[in-house]
Amino acid sequence: MARVLRDPHWVAVGLLTWAALGLLVAGHEGHGDLHRDVEEDFHGHSHGHSHEDFHHGHSHGHGHTHESIWHGHAHSHDHGHSREDVHHGHSHGHSHDSLHHRGHGHSHGASREAGAPGIKHHLDTVTLWAYALGATVLISAAPFFVLFLIPVESNSPRHRSLLQILLSFASGGLLGDAFLHLIPHALEPHSHDTPAQPGHGHSHSGQGPILSVGLWVLSGIVAFLVVEKFVRHVKGGHGHAHAHGHGHSHGDSHAHGHSHAHGDRHECPSKGKPSSEDEKEAGGLRKRRGGDTGPRDGPLKPQNPEEEKTGSDLRVSGYLNLAADLAHNFTDGLAIGASFRGGRGLGILTTMTVLLHEVPHEVGDFAILVQSGCSKKQAMRLQLLTAIGALAGTACALLTEGGAVGSEVAGGAGPGWVLPFTAGGFIYVATVSVLPELLREASPLQSLLEVLGLLGGVAMMVLIAHLE
C-alpha cells in the first residue's frame, strides 16, 4: 500500500479528484444564486404598479390596481419582487386616495417576514465567540488530516518526484490566490450603509484605489525581497558558505600539512552530513599520510558550494512563505469573525468557503517547507503556528465595534493594505522561490505532471473564486 501511495501518478489522480469535488460543490453552490437574486430583489430598483391588499403585496409587471383599503390609483417604484407585510419594502409612490388622504408617500421599509432570506439571527456574546473561534480552529486543523496522507517525509531523492509535483501545485495555488482572490477583492468597490437608511449606500471607486492596490502589491514584493536579503546577510554575507583558503604546505618525510583558512562558514542545521563526510575524508588522508591523528587547523572547502547555496535559499523562502501565510490567515480570521456577526448561516457558509480554500493552500505550504529542509513533523508544526494569525484575526473582528474591520475584509476591501500586500508576498514566493525549482532537468512524464500540478493549483483557486 505504501508503495502505491509513493507513486506520483496517484498524487496527480488525487489532485484531479479534489478538483472534481470542487466542481460538484460549485454546482451545488449555484442554488445559492437564488438567495442572491432574492437579496437583489430587496435592494434592486424596478418600476411597476403593485397589487396590494391589507396583508401583503406582490409586485410584478405594469398595471393598475384598486386597493382594498386605500382604494385608488398607485404608481410606485418598488425594490424587488417580493411578498411583503403591510409597510414592507422601499418604495416611492404617488397615490390618489378616495377615502382618506391624497399626496406623496415616501417610505423606507426595514421589516421583513420571519424566515426571509438574508435575515440576521443575532447571537449572544458567548455563543458568537464560541462559533467564530470554533470555526477558526476547524479550518486550521482540518488540513492536517490531508497532510498525514501525503507520503513525503523529507526532501530526499526518494521523494523528489512527488515533492516536485506538490511544489508545482503550491506555485499554482499561490499565484491563483494572489491574482484571482486577493487582488480582485482588494479592487472591489465597497459601500457604506447607515443604520437609519440601510437601503442606501455609496461606493468608492476610481483610479485612486486601483493605483493604491497596485502600489501595495509592489510593496509586498519589495518587502519580501528586503527580508530575504537581510536574512542572507545575517546568515553570512550572501546566505551561503564562503571558504577562502590559502594553503601553505611544507612537505617533509612525515608529510605534515599546514593550512590557513580565511572566511566564515555558516551552514543550515540540516547540512550536517557534508561535514561528517569531510571528517571521514580527512581521516582517510591522515591514514595515508602515516596515521597522523592530530587536529586540523582549518575546515575543508565544501564539496558542492552551489548545492549548499540552493539549500540555504530555500530555507529562507520557507520562512518567507510562513510570514505570508500568517498574514493570509489573519484575513481569513477577520472574514470568519465578521460573518458570524452577520448571522450563524452566513458564518457557516464563510467557514466552508475558507476551508475549501485552505486545504490546497496548506498542502502547497507543506511542500515548500519540506523543500526548504524541514522534516514532515517540523513542517506540520510550523504550519500549526500560523493558526495564531487566524485566531488573532477572528478576535479582532469580534472585538471591533460592529465588526467594521472584519466586514470590509469579508466584503473584499479589507484594511487597505492587508490583501494586496499579502498578494505581493505570495507572488514573490511563487516566482522567486518555487518556480525555479521546477526548471530542473526532469523526464518528459515528470515535467508533464508538474505542469498539470500547477494548473491544478490554479483550477482550485478558480473554483474557490466561483464559490465566493
From Swiss-Prot:
One of its GO terms (molecular function) is zinc ion transmembrane transporter activity. Disulfide bonds: none annotated. The chain crosses the membrane at residues 10-30, 132-152, 163-183, 208-228, 385-405, 409-429, 447-467. One of its GO terms (cellular component) is Golgi apparatus. It is a multi-pass membrane protein. Induction: In cardiomyocytes, high-glucose exposure up-regulated SLC39A7 expression and induced its phosphorylation. It is found in: Endoplasmic reticulum membrane; Golgi apparatus, cis-Golgi network membrane. It catalyses: Zn(2+)(in) = Zn(2+)(out). Residues 237-248 have a biased composition (Basic residues). Homodimer. Transports Zn(2+) from the endoplasmic reticulum (ER)/Golgi apparatus to the cytosol, playing an essential role in the regulation of cytosolic zinc levels. Acts as a gatekeeper of zinc release from intracellular stores, requiring post-translational activation by phosphorylation on residues, resulting in activation of multiple downstream pathways leading to cell growth and proliferation. Has an essential role in B cell development and is required for proper B cell receptor signaling. This is Zinc transporter SLC39A7. The gene is Slc39a7.
